[in-house]
Amino acid sequence: MKKISLLLMLSCVLSLQAQLRNNDVYEVTEMEQSRVRREIRIPNVDDYKVLKCDFHTHTVFSDGKVWPDTRVMEAWQEGLDAVAITDHIEYLPHKEIIKADLNESYKIAKKAADASGFIVIKGTEITRSKPLGHLNALFINDVMPMDVEDPLKAIDEAVRQGAFIMWNHPGWPDDKSTFYPVHEELIKAGKIHGLEVFNHMEYYPACFDWAM
């Protein structure tokens, strides 16, 4: 008798579920993008709280392939605490399709991040061929004044805005990590503050030694 009652209840539940389904549209929630976050545990140092951040990212507003809010979601899923949006100033391969102010990608990312309490850093990438190469300007206020022909003037504007300036991927694109005189001059002038030793799938051992 108990088995019959149990089967009857199960049949009723299945019937009810079938009735609740919309025959026109049924949402398959299992297909939603994962909201699982990977945990990266790094201990704090003395009284300083350690945050995990990606300081070099691009979106469709320069040569990236995703919308800015997707960069925020990716960073959160990877276990980071913050992400910098650093679209190129000069290299805009999608500019015929995406026409916007150079600050727009940050605005979109910031709106998405605020909804989840995530940190987004405003930045940009000053993009030139070697010997100068590419430099990220982080913690800036406005990208537009850096859109100038002379890259040294762009760097000066970034410094004026209180930026942290990072020399990006010194070993790219020629597979040679070369410390040029222009970098020595900028470092002595206090206009380069950091060095990227790993980018995408490349590690630059010589640059690690320079940084140390």
Protein language model regions, located:
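Positively charged n-region of N-terminal signal peptides that target proteins for export
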Residues: 1-4
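A periodicity- and composition-biased signal for non-globular, repetitive helical segments
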Residues: 8-9, 64
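Hydrophobic h-region of N-terminal signal peptides that target proteins for export
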Residues: 9-17
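Generic secondary-structure boundary signal with a strong preference for alpha-helix termini
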Residues: 14-15, 68, 174
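Cleaved targeting-peptide boundary
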Residues: 19-26
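A metal-dependent hydrolase metal-coordination microenvironment
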Residues: 32-161, 168, 177, 181-182, ...
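Extracellular glycoside hydrolase catalytic/binding regions
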Residues: 170-172
